[in-house]
């Protein structure tokens, strides 16, 4: 009789551990297919546009109750390619992104609810230059295959809120305040 209870105990432990492992799935960013770009409007000139070459990201989906989902994406600031190449050093300097002291910018969803929608919005934490602000993020999810999804997002941010542009560059008369970050992300399900 004791043996039966011990066996049942270990069987229950094993089942609960395997359920916890199965109840979460991870999706990893394909860095070669994905892109994260930004744009800052400029009065009477071409907008400042850039693309980050070094990006990372992961999404964890809570399959059990769909409430504790998490996603985090980051860019290495000095990996930017931009249309105003002669101003790249200025953009990386302490006047704008200060990439020496703040080499990474990131978006963190914390916990969010997801119930297989194709489009939805979240409030996320955007961290630039060591400053974190809550901003809205519009998300479109395209299921390409069982193990591959595409995520497109639009995120508006205030450059002055993050001190992007100091001194004579703080003015929003020429270089406007509202910036946009657009992503086209491809993620593969982790086995």
Enumerate the language-model features and the residues they cover:
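Low-complexity, acidic/polar, glycine-enriched regions of mature
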Residues: 17-191
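Sec-dependent N-terminal signal peptides
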Residues: 4-13
